[in-house]
């Protein structure tokens, strides 16, 4: 929005041309979303408290979590609104990728909002039934996949890129739709499963979002893409503004979500942020890199799959409780230790993901 204004004002003062630079608008995206989150966070927390929109805590979980009962939830709305405003202000609104990622984020956020609303407001412990949750995730995920497939302008946009193998890639054809569906829906649910401790999900999301933002910038620049032997995706660079907004909004939310949390993001935030990461990774053709950088999300998801499969097949549980962060809590780890160690793991994995830029 402001980019259009800057383009108009250039005829009066050439200095406004500085807003054409992606790096500047990415930084402004971070700062705008951060300021919005910090400024409106206290108001949102008070509003949620006044309306008694608080978290319910399971009795069979770690006993330390009982003190969290009643903590305001659905704070993910603060993240999404900050991301949305910042992106609309600083991104090029004629870029189709910006709209795809923004719409996917908001639509998955809507699914999470309905789920949270039923749990917290209607006091329905089941929330949105799983079949309906997955149905709408599938509808929106497939919709995004089909759109990206139909609007692909080059073959590389539907090709699976294998990091560290510069001369080998897999043309997917229509299989791109299937892969994209699983990446978007899978990452959405993976972040949601991780969101079980104060700050556990949001900081890895910020880190992975920052890593993907670097890939967006490089993939959208033909010279950098050719030099680094990564796919050149025209227009993908504009997503650095969205990634910047995600980082700013996430850090602003973490200010209130850090242990002991004043607010939880709820499904409205977790489902949306996971879907955003998946969609960005698909656009820049870095699904495997997302798998690496988001290793904490993958680990949390696998722990649930293993736990359920083991119990159904043998009647025994592999972990004391799943997702795996609860397993460590029940082993006696203090919550902050679990959180920070998972953050450290994410830092390492993001660096490994970025290292694939040169290991080709």
UniProtKB/Swiss-Prot annotation:
Membrane-topology descriptor: Multi-pass membrane protein
Enzyme's top EC category: transferase
Pathways per UniProt: Cell wall biogenesis; peptidoglycan biosynthesis
Assigned keywords, A-Z: Cell cycle, Cell division, Cell inner membrane, Cell membrane, Cell shape, Cell wall biogenesis/degradation, Magnesium, Membrane, Metal-binding, Peptidoglycan synthesis, Transferase, Transmembrane, Transmembrane helix
Signal peptide region: none
Cofactor: Mg(2+)
GO biological process, one term: regulation of cell shape
Entry EC no(s): 2.7.8.13
Pfam families: Glycos_transf_4, MraY_sig1
Localization terms from the record: Cell inner membrane
InterPro entries per the UniProt record, alphabetical: Glycosyl_transferase_4, PNAcMuramoyl-5peptid_Trfase, PNAcMuramoyl-5peptid_Trfase_CS
Main localization, broad class: membrane
Recorded GO CC terms: plasma membrane
Catalytic activity annotation: UDP-N-acetyl-alpha-D-muramoyl-L-alanyl-gamma-D-glutamyl-meso-2,6-diaminopimeloyl-D-alanyl-D-alanine + di-trans,octa-cis-undecaprenyl phosphate = di-trans,octa-cis-undecaprenyl diphospho-N-acetyl-alpha-D-muramoyl-L-alanyl-D-glutamyl-meso-2,6-diaminopimeloyl-D-alanyl-D-alanine + UMP
Residue intervals passing through the bilayer: 16-36, 73-93, 97-117, 134-154, 168-188, 199-219, 236-256, 263-283, 288-308, 338-358
Example of a GO MF term: phospho-N-acetylmuramoyl-pentapeptide-transferase activity
Membership in a protein family: Belongs to the glycosyltransferase 4 family. MraY subfamily.
NCBIfam families in the record: mraY (TIGR00445)
Summary of the function given for this chain in its UniProt record: Catalyzes the initial step of the lipid cycle reactions in the biosynthesis of the cell wall peptidoglycan: transfers peptidoglycan precursor phospho-MurNAc-pentapeptide from UDP-MurNAc-pentapeptide onto the lipid carrier undecaprenyl phosphate, yielding undecaprenyl-pyrophosphoryl-MurNAc-pentapeptide, known as lipid I.
PANTHER family reported in the protein's UniProt record: PHOSPHO-N-ACETYLMURAMOYL-PENTAPEPTIDE-TRANSFERASE, PHOSPHO-N-ACETYLMURAMOYL-PENTAPEPTIDE-TRANSFERASE HOMOLOG
Protein name: Phospho-N-acetylmuramoyl-pentapeptide-transferase
Name of the gene encoding the protein in the UniProt record: mraY
């Amino acid at each position: 929005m402001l980019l259009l204004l800057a383009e108009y004002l250039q005829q009066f003062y050439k200095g406004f041309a500085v807003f054409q630079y992606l790096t500047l608008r990415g930084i402004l995206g971070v700062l705008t979303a951060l300021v919005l989150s910090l400024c409106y966070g206290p108001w949102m927390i008070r509003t949620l408290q006044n309306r008694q929109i608080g978290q319910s805590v399971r009795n069979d979980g770690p006993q330390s979590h009982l003190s969290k009962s009643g903590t305001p939830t659905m704070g993910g709305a603060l993240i999404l609104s900050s991301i949305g405003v910042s992106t609309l202000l600083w991104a090029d609104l004629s870029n189709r990728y910006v709209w795809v990622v923004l719409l996917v984020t908001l639509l998955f956020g809507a699914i999470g909002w309905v789920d949270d609303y039923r749990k917290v407001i209607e006091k329905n412990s089941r929330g949105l039934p799983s079949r309906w949750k997955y149905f709408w995730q599938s509808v929106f995920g497939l919709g995004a996949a089909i759109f990206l497939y139909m609007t692909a302008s080059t073959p590389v946009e539907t090709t699976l890129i294998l990091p560290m193998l510069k001369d080998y890639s897999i043309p997917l054809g229509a299989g791109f739709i299937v892969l994209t569906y699983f990446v978007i829906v899978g990452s959405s649910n993976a972040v949601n499963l991780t969101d079980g401790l104060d700050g556990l999900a949001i900081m890895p999301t910020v880190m992975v979002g920052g890593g993907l933002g670097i890939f967006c910038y490089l993939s959208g620049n033909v010279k950098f893409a050719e030099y680094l032997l990564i796919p050149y995706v025209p227009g993908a660079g504009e997503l650095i503004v969205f990634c910047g907004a995600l980082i700013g909004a996430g850090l602003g939310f973490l200010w209130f979500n850090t242990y002991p949390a004043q607010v939880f993001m709820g499904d409205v935030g977790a489902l949306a942020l996971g879907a955003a990461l998946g969609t960005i990774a698909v656009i820049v053709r870095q699904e495997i890199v997302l798998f690496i950088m988001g290793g904490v999300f993958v680990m949390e998801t696998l722990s649930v799959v293993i736990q359920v499969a083991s119990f159904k097949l043998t009647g025994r549980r592999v972990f004391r409780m799943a997702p795996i962060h609860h397993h460590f809590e029940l082993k006696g780890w203090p919550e902050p230790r679990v959180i920070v160690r998972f953050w450290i793991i994410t830092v390492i994995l993001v660096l490994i993901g970025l290292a694939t830029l040169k290991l080709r």
